[in-house]
Structures are given as C-alpha cells and as structure tokens.
C-alpha cells in the first residue's frame, strides 16, 4: 500500500504471520515494513524500531501504523470490518482514515458530529499504559507538517468530540 507522509508517497508492505490457537483457529497478524528500495533512506527506517526517535519520527511511525494499517485492511478485505481494535495510541490515526472515508466531503470539510460518532461506534481502544507519559501528544504544527494541513485541520476540527483517543 502507499501512504502520504509530508507530501511524499511512502510504500508499505506487509508480512503475514498466522497464530494458531488451542482450538486450531488461525488468526493472521500483519507486520508493516517500509524498508523498500523505492522509499527514501529515512522512510526505510520508520519500521526498524518501536519506541525510538523524536516526536517527528514517532508521528511518522504512527502514520505508517494507523493510516498504513487502515490502507492494508482496506486492500485485503473487500468488506470493512465492523469493529477496529486499537491497542495503545500508536494506531490512533486509523480513526482519521475512517473519518475521511466516511465523510460526505471526503475529509475536505470539518467532520460532522454524526460522522465522528459513526467512527466512535466502529472503534475499540485498549491501553496498558494508563498514565499521561504512556500516550504520545504532538504539536499541531508537526501534525500539519507530517499529515498535510487539510488532514491536520480535519483532526483539529473534531478535537472537541474526538474519536482519536
């Protein structure tokens, strides 16, 4: 899949691993990878390490996980899952992708309360670090730089009734 980071097209591939439970049921787990020759050397490092780098690097990683993960789910499954489960805040930008895809304007205008509520109904969030230090916070100027001003404003417009956790 391809995502946009700072106006650049970043290719993301997935590695599939199946976990088999005691009952024999298999659950696929996908690992996202940006170490592709068509990406810039810096973009290739985004999936090298978890919990590394400065705020800029971390936000770019969260774009890969949240928006890249959503793009992968959309590419693999012709029908959308009913519920999206986000573990910790690292994938929270998935909600912005959901908001854009469910928006009447395609994310070009501020989301309505009904659109924000529809995203809320599709999401489950689990945290294992229920303290402020366990959740990334990014300045709006950095968000605007990484996501682009229009996407950043979509998130800002829904901040008061945010599905973004």
Regions found by a protein language model. Give the residues of each.
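Catalytic cores of carbohydrate-active enzymes across secretory and cytosolic contexts
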Residues: 1-165
């Amino acid at each position: 899949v391809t995502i946009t980071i700072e106006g650049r097209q970043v290719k993301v591939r997935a590695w599939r691993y199946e976990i088999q439970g005691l009952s024999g049921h298999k659950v696929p787990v996908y690992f996202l990878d940006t170490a592709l020759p068509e990406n810039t050397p810096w973009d290739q490092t985004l999936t090298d390490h978890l919990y590394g780098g400065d705020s800029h690097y971390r936000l770019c990683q969260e774009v890969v996980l949240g928006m890249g993960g959503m793009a992968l789910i959309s590419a693999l499954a012709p029908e959308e899952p009913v519920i999206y489960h986000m573990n910790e805040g690292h994938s929270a930008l998935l909600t912005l992708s959901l908001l854009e895809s469910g928006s009447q304007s395609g994310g070009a205008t501020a989301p309505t309360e009904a659109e924000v509520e529809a995203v809320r109904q599709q999401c489950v969030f689990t945290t294992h670090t229920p303290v402020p230090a366990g959740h990334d916070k990014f300045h709006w100027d950095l968000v605007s730089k990484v996501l682009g001003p229009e996407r950043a404003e979509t998130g800002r417009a829904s901040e008061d009734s945010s599905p973004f956790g």
